[in-house]
Structures are given as C-alpha cells and as structure tokens.
Amino acid sequence: MCALVPSFFTNFGWPSTNQYESYYGAGDNLNNGTFLELTVPQTYEVTHHQNSLGVSVSSEGNEIDNNPVVVKKLNHNASERDRRKKINTLFSSLRSCLPASDQSKKLSIPETVSKSLKYIPELQQQVKRLIQKKEEILVRVSGQRDFELYDKQQPKAVASYLSTVSATRLGDNEVMVQVSSSKIHNFSISNVLGGIEEDGFVLVDVSSSRSQGERLFYTLHLQVENMDDYKINCEELSERMLYLYEKCENSFN
C-alpha cells in the first residue's frame, strides 16, 4: 500500500534518480500520469517583457506606426532637430560677417548677437565715408576730363569765335545795339555802320570798352529816319548786324 502512494514532495518534472515505474501501478501509461512536465521555456524572459509592454515581437513595428502619439512625438523630435540645425547655420553665417578678431573666438549665440548689433553701425559709417570718397573722386575725375576737353577744343573755339549782337528797342524809332567781339579779329565798326545806314538807320551815339580778356564791347544808339518805310524789329536787326560783322571779318582775312 505504501509502495503505491508517491512521496509528499514531488520532483515537479525534474529528472528523478528513481525509476518512473516505481510511482505507477502495472498497466498505467506514463503519458497519462497525474504529474505535469513543468519545464521553463528559453524565451520566458523575452515573452514576459513583451507581455508587460503589451507589444509582441512580430507586431512591434506596426504598433508604433499605428500609434498616433508615438508618431507625433517622433515627428516633433525630427522637426526640432532640423530647426536647431538651421538656427546654428544662420548664426554661423552671422558670425562669419564679424571682424576677423571676433571670428577666431568661440562666441555663444548671445555674444554673437551683441557683437553684431555693435558692428552694424560701424559698417554703416564706413559705407557713408566710402560713398563720400567716391563722389569726391568722381568730381575730380570729371573736372579733369572737362579741362582736358576744353583744352583740346580751345584753339578751334578761338579760331571760329563769333561776335554776339543784341538789340533793345528804346522807343518807336530808337534802338540800342550792343556788340561783343574778340580783339584778335580784324573788325572795323565803321564798315558795320556803313551797312546799317544803307538800311535807313542813323547813328546817334557810339561807345566802346575793353575787358581784361580778349573782348571788345560796342554800344550803338540808332534811330530810324522814316517810320513809315521801316518798322523796327530787334531780332532782325541783331541778325543784320551779325551778318555785317562776319562780312567785314571775312574781307580782312
């Protein structure tokens, strides 16, 4: 009787030093016994960890993709990394615009901003000074060019210089004519007066003066003998006087 009852403490599936037959009666099947094989699986710890997280190995990637909270957090982290990278690039570019003495130092972002704010007004003053210097140089260059151009054209201008004539009406039958001429030209006022007398004008008075340069000035006071035959036109008279002067000049050349 005692041989058929198993001991109180079993081996719980661990190999026993005794024969299995000592615990079973004749004709009993070993597979139908009352004792269970309690072997510990090798993946117990992994399975336990997965079960505690509620995610299986095969579906872990799908669960992350389908979890909006996790996806949102990952996207936020990626955006934050990109934002910081762009900010660092911008501040690096700003730092490169500072003077060389400041670029050699490892400046923090606040220091970079502070030095940039101080450096901007200095650059603005430098730009103003450079613009002013440029304008001064342009004025000097332009003046030099004008002088050279005038110097080249001066002989030709003197050779072809003409007198100027202006007429001013004083009354119904009186007019004052002013003539300006160069002294280097051969000019005879008597020849001009002879021409205008033929046109019906009478000389009342004449005066002349000289300037410090090569200029002669004549002032003629003329009257018209017959107002019925001639109406004073100052513009036409000026052109007539200039024509007579040029005619006299050519006759002397």
UniProtKB/Swiss-Prot annotation:
PANTHER family: ACHAETE-SCUTE TRANSCRIPTION FACTOR-RELATED, TRANSCRIPTION FACTOR ORG2-RELATED. It is found in: Nucleus. The keyword Transcription regulation applies. Pfam families: HLH (PF00010). The gene is ORG2. It comes from Arabidopsis thaliana. GO terms for biological process: cellular response to iron ion starvation; regulation of DNA-templated transcription; regulation of transcription by RNA polymerase II. Roots. The keyword Lipid metabolism does not apply. SMART domains: HLH. PROSITE patterns: BHLH. Coiled coil: none annotated. GO terms for molecular function: DNA binding; DNA-binding transcription factor activity; protein dimerization activity. Keywords: DNA-binding, Nucleus, Transcription, Transcription regulation. One of its GO terms (cellular component) is nucleus. Residues 71-123 form the bHLH domain. Its main location: nucleus. This is Transcription factor ORG2. Induction: Induced by OBP3, auxin and salicylic acid (SA). Repressed by jasmonic acid (JA), UV LIGHT, and heat treatments. Up regulated by iron deficiency in roots and leaves, as well as by nickel, high zinc or high copper treatments. Repressed by high iron, low copper and low zinc treatments. CDD domains: bHLH_AtORG2_like. Homodimer.
